[in-house]
Amino acid sequence: MLDSFYALSFPMQKNKLVNKCAFAWNHLVRFLMQKTYPAYCRRHPLSRGICDTVYEAPLIVSFTSFPERIPTIGATVESILRQSLKPNKVLLWLAKEQFPEEKVPCELKKYLDAGLEVRFCDEDLKPHKKSYYTAEAYPDSIIVTIDDEILYGESFLRRLYEAYQNSDKHTVICELGHEIRIGDDNKPKKYNEWNWEAIGLEGPSDLLMPKGAGGVLYPPGFFRDEYFDIEAIRENCLMADDLWLKFMELLHGYKVKKTRAYAKNVYSSKQETQKYALANSNNGENRNNVFLSNLVKKFDQIHWEELK
C-alpha cells in the first residue's frame, strides 16, 4: 500500500525548478499517505512480520524511540512488520531512565505477537541506541537501522538487501545520503556546505554519508571496537549518530552505496512528529558543524584528500 504512494512521488532532481514543483506534489502525496494508512492497517490485520528464513546472516531491523514519540510510533512499526522481505528480528530499544518501570508501552503491545521485540537499555545513548545495543548483542548480523517516525514502503527492506547482495561486502547500503565536500585545506567543509541528498550519485563512494531516516544496512562485522567507545560518543557527538557511523566507515575502509542515484524522499507518519525531529534540531542550531569538527580532530589519521 505504501509502495503505491511512493510510486506516485517524484524523485529528487538537480534542477531547482523541477524540485520545487515535485515538492508541492510530494507534499500532497505525503498528506494522503498519512491520512489513509491508519485506516488501511485497521482493515488489514497484521500477520507475522518476521521470519525464520536463513539469509547470508541474521537480518535485524533496529530502532529506538522516546516517550513523546510513542503515541505515534505505531504506523512505523506497522510499515516494518508489513515488509515483502521479512527480517529475522525487529528490535526497539528504550532507555530505562525514560521508561523506569520497564514495561512495554500500551500502544506497542499489539505488535508483540507479530514479531516486535521491545528491549530496555541501561544508558540513554540518544539516537545511537538503535545501532549500539543491537550491534553489541548481534555483531555478526546484518543490521538495518530505521527512524521511528517514518513510513517505510513494503519493498524498502528488499531493496536494501538486494543492493547489499550485489555489492562488495565492505559496503554500507542506504536509501538516502549526503555527499561530503572537501575544502582547500583537505578537510571536510561545514555540514551545511555538503552536497545534500547527493542527487545523481549512487556510489559506492567514501564521501557518501548515509542519512539515517531513509534506513541504513550495515554488513556483518561492521561494528568494531572503536564504535563502542561510549566516552568518545558522549564527548563528541551524542546527538549525531550518522556522523559517528560515517567516521567508523572511513576508519575501516567501508564505502557507501545508495540503492538508486535519484532517490525518493521518505515521509513521516504524522506531521506533528517533525517538531521532535533530531535532524531539524541539529541542522537548525548548526550543531552538526560542532560534532563534525570534534570528530575531524579526534580521528586525525583520516586522509581526506585520498577519499573518492
Q: Which ranges hold each PLM region?
A:
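Residues at the starts of beta-strands that form the adenosine-phosphate
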Residues: N88-K89, I142, K255
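C-terminal catalytic/acceptor-binding lobe
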Residues: L2-Y40, E56, D225, A232-K308
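A conserved hydrophobic helix/loop-capping motif in glycosyltransferases and polysaccharide synthases
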Residues: I60-E68, Q83
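Cell-envelope/extracellular polymer assembly enzymes that use nucleotide-activated donors
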Residues: A57-S62, K89, W244
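Active-site-proximal specificity loops/subdomain of glycosyltransferases
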Residues: W93-S141
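Conserved catalytic core of nucleotide-sugar-dependent glycosyltransferases
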Residues: T134-A135, G153-I230
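Short beta-strand-to-loop acidic/aromatic patch adjacent to the donor-nucleotide binding site
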Residues: D140-L151
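Short, acidic, metal-binding catalytic loop of nucleotide-sugar glycosyltransferases
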Residues: T76-N88, K96, K110
